[in-house]
Amino acid sequence: MSSSPTPDGVTPAEELPVEPVPTPSSFARAMILVTVSICTMLYALTVTIVNVALPQLQGALSATPDQIAWVVTLNVIATAVVTPMTGWLVSRLGERPLLLWAISGFAASTLLCATATSLETLLLYRIAQGAFGAPIVPLSQSILLVNFTGKDRPMAQGFFGMTVVVGPAVGPALGGYFAEAHDWRWVFYLIVPLCAVAFLLVITFIRPASKEQSAKLDWTGFLALSFAIICMQLLVDRGERFDWFASREIIFYACGAALAFYLFIVHTLTSDAPFLNPQLFKDRNFALGLILVFIYGMLNFTPITLLPPMLHDLKGYPDSLIGLLLAMRGLGMVIGFFTAGRLGWLDPRVTFFVGMVLNGISGFLLAAANVDVSPDAIAWAGVLQGIGSGMMWVPLVTMSFATLPDRFMPDGSAIFHLLRNFGTSIFISISFMVVVRTARMNYAEFAENITPYKESLRFPVVTGAWDLETVEGLARIGDEMDRQAQMVGYDNAFIMYAIVCFLSLPLLLLVRVKRG
């Protein structure tokens, strides 16, 4: 929460004399970049690294699939609730102390997760982990944006962006290796040394900055926004599992989110000191950037969420090969970030346009896959998608924060990453809904055309080893129909992915770019 305007329109930050801050040297700025990147990476890794250990966790803690899902859900909810508080926490503690507290709490809660002996204690520690980790990414980006301006910002954002996006991409591979070689506890132990390194780097290279005047927390706005966030996150996480609005629980979440969000907006527009300063959203580029980062969140993690179950269930690929194919996407991201950083002189709308088009093309390539698709085809589509995502991130940050005043950076960065995470959660849920429902429809269509009385299916060249006269033969062909129907479901999800890419392009026409 940034300092809110007083009735005469002057913010408390403007009333206080601000001492000029000396410009850091090139080496100091380079170390600031390394520091905030490592801080971000240690949090970004935990976003996906735990997912691969869920089967082990379920067995070790004697939990049902629905119960073990809360290990992910509660962590995401805690992160989403605390993220908007980053600006207010900065005004109370300062950037450097807050970052140190966040890293310390994150390390302690991660270590406790590794020592959990019951599902209840693990869930409690995961909530703490999400809450302490929430300020790390927006705070790191805020520090970066203040220290890198002008022509230096694109290259710095390119390096920083790799840790934001590549971390979750390599998380499953690392988590899978340590979970198989040791056990699920090592998924958490792995993060602790990174926390220690990040803590030492922050102490050494992040300078204490002058605090803004401490602002009171707008509890009404905070609680309304928090309740809306909790309901929305539960809705998207549990919607498909409970058949969406056929469930009273999901209807309650939807109504609760709508009501709480309405109260938050009304309170923000009428309060003298709201939780989020409305001046944030008066910046045209930042407001458009929030829409674009929501779309970016929709696109970025969806492929790496859809591909593992598709390749494992329909192709029978081992986890090692799936991890390698996902790593190819990470390689593409590195290329994309580096390319976007080197193209800092180019209109950021052009770079973003190219990245979005590459994402759309990769979506159509994956949508053309069938059950006989080769690993090479998946790898090529992944590289292309990675390059596109990398090329989108740098100009997205450049456009969004180009005209936002420094005093709004903590709040702006927090909302920016909150919407990115929401976009990811919502689109992944929608994508799996498309997979499940269209697969069910296609299975029904296949079944209409597969009967023992159809003459064309009596030829050996068609049936192969299937004997339609036996129960076993019918079961085998039923399994194959299910496999083909699921493949069509995944294809439909990737078609939707590609369509979203191309339909989003006209938004770039609304972005204004400073000339000269």
Predicted feature locations:
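Membrane-embedded alpha-helical segments in integral membrane proteins
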Residues: N51, P55, I68, S109-C113, ...
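C-terminal membrane-cytosol helix-exit motif in multi-pass small-molecule transporters
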Residues: V192-K211, S226-R238, G256-T270, L505-R512
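Helix-loop-helix hairpins in multi-pass membrane proteins, especially solute transporters
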Residues: V76, T83-G221
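Transmembrane helix-loop junctions in multipass membrane proteins, especially transporters and channels
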Residues: S118, E180, I203-E212, R241-F242, ...
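12-transmembrane solute porter fold
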Residues: R29-L45, V50-L54, L61-A80, G87, ...
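Flexible interhelical linker loops that connect adjacent transmembrane helices
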Residues: E19-T23, K151, F199-S226, R241-A246, ...
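Hydrophobic transmembrane architecture of multi-pass small-molecule transporters
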Residues: P22, V197, I415, R420-L510
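Cytosolic juxtamembrane N-terminal segment immediately preceding the first transmembrane helix
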Residues: S2-Y43
